[in-house]
Amino acid sequence: MVVSYPNHERNYCVFDVNKINKLTSKREGALPIIEEKLLSAKNEDDIIENLYAINLLLDNGIDKNKISELYPTLAKFNDSKSPNIQTYLAGIYRKTKIPDAFGPLVKMLIQDSINPPKNSHFDPTEEIGGAILDYLA
């Protein structure tokens, strides 16, 4: 299954649950696999699938510091114009509060405010703005 993107009926992505569960069941052991997949990602599907896996790992209690170590790899996508990539990155940064990620979040928010994403079925600035507020709280 490829990623099913948000549409007029659903404002979130759908992933291959079995594939994601198999990967995230490895917990910390999944991180090198995810990092390699992100470094070699060829398309948005590959990127957001692995960002989603990181979000799930964080939701399941993985040590935030372990995810913070992936920041150099995650930062590769900080300039993305994709609302999907921006939303997943903002979610990760919101949960980890990686200090170096604050500036890129502000940049995303400003860029999206000036040039809102077109053909998006949700507003990524909600997640980005929420992440920024969590940094400031």
Ranges and model annotations:
Residues M1-Y5, S25-L39, G61-F77, I98-P116:
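Amphipathic alpha-helical scaffolding segments comprising HEAT/armadillo-like alpha-solenoid repeats
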Residues R10-K26, E36, D45-K64, K76, ...:
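Structural detector for internal amphipathic alpha-helices that build alpha-solenoid repeat scaffolds
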